[in-house]
Amino acid sequence: MHLILSKVKDGKYSFVVSPVHIKETEVIPDEIEKNRLMALFEELGTKANIDLFRARQRAESLVNYGFGVADAAHVAFAEECGAKFITCDDRLLKKCKKHDISVWCDNPIMFCLTEKIQ
């Protein structure tokens, strides 16, 4: 992730922060980790202007496919803003590949290989 974030700092990529990122981070009990993540969102994050109603509808349909609520919200948000979806959660990736996810989904290593980031 550090390699990808360094490219975000350089302006090559955008790091889209969703309301789900914020909500998940707000409940982290470790104040140091929580503050570090919030600072990262503030420094590097971009807020996308999307149709939250459509994203919510899509998230609900993904939940019906067996996605967890937070995972469904992350994926729906990525779809709504047309962002590539990067996760380290192999089970989530398996679900994404099984269902009709309209954006690129994979792990950080595959993102770096696909984008030829070194």
What is the role of each PLM region?
Residues 7, 47, 75, 79-118:
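Acidic, PIN/NYN-like endoribonuclease modules and their adjacent C-terminal/linker elements
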Residues 1-30:
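PIN/NYN-family metal-dependent endoribonuclease catalytic core
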Residues 28-42:
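Short, electropositive alpha-helical surface patch
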Residues 28, 62, 98-99:
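Residue-level signal for well-ordered alpha-helical positions
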Residues 20-23, 41-64:
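Acidic catalytic patch
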Residues 58, 67-74, 83:
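Mid-chain, well-packed structural core segment of small domains
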Residues 62-66, 116-118:
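Short, surface-exposed amphipathic charged segments that create phosphate/polyanion-binding patches used
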